[in-house]
Amino acid sequence: MSNALARKRKRMQPLGYTKDELLRMQRYAKTQSNTNDLIEESFLNIRLISFQILHDKFGFGYKRLMKVEKIIKEYLNTTAAGGLSTEQLQFCMREKCGIDAKAEANRVPFRESFSLVERKVAPGSMQTAGKFLAASICNYYALLGVCLKTGFNFSKRQVAETLEWIRY
């Protein structure tokens, strides 16, 4: 191959993208992956904390905890299918329990919300990660509150007490 053809080959990028575009896409994919991991891990950990509290404070055994898990999965599936939104769940919790899930989630201290995830968060992305963690906590509070109120006939006081124990 001649030198001219070799130079031309080096300039050409795969798939018609420039090197900068490829790097930008890789960075975006990496941040999306990190965000998804952060949300999933925090959701899993807050779920485990709530199960421990329901077991210790309210005497829930394996069967009732699995019923809570089943009801929450049903809510998540209907939310994913578009039949129910998290705003509707928050409204339902506000109407039935008199508790604002968003306000409760915002009462969780910023630094302590990062204890829900094992991975270290880069200092530059702390604000956005904190917002994602607060949203994850808010969504789980709404799911759990509606589940306990409708599925187990918890009183307003019991739901509020459960959310307070989860916060600490």
Could you describe each region identified by the protein language model?
Residues 5-50, 78, 84-145:
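Intrinsic disorder/low-complexity detector
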